[in-house]
Amino acid sequence: QRQMCIRDSLSAVDARESRRIKARVEAERLPRGADPARHVKLGRGGLSDVEWLVQSMQLKHAGQIEDLRVTGTLPALRAIARHGLLPEAEVAVLEEAWLLATRIRAALLLWTGKVSDVLPTNMRDLEAVARLSGVGTTGGELEERYLRVTRLARQVFETRFYGL
């Protein structure tokens, strides 16, 4: 079992540096020409946003709340909810976005045979990903749900991460 390095809290300087690094990651890591609304890993409201927010909250509160000393995103989100660090509705949005992005990534791998982090625009590929992921019955339904959920997750991320 790995040991976690726990501080009493996240300093204002550390929080500011974390926000600066996240902004840099967003500016530099998204592949050139990629639509940030469709990139399930690095795009708006995707895996990266949820994980950055969760890990920042762990850094800020794990010194006082032992339940936050976990390595998984979903167990940490559930601990955040249990301890009232975020409203249940916001936790539900973040969890749905993370699960949806994870299912889409797995379905893309099954469909294409390679790792891909971009929600397809081609309707045939969208239909296949919808079926394989179990999310919706049509490509349009999958696309609409993903774009809606990640838009909401990004709103939570921006409010909470930049408000730390």
What feature does the model see in each segment?
Residues Q1-Q3, R7-L164:
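A nucleotide- and high-energy phosphate-metabolite-utilizing enzyme signature
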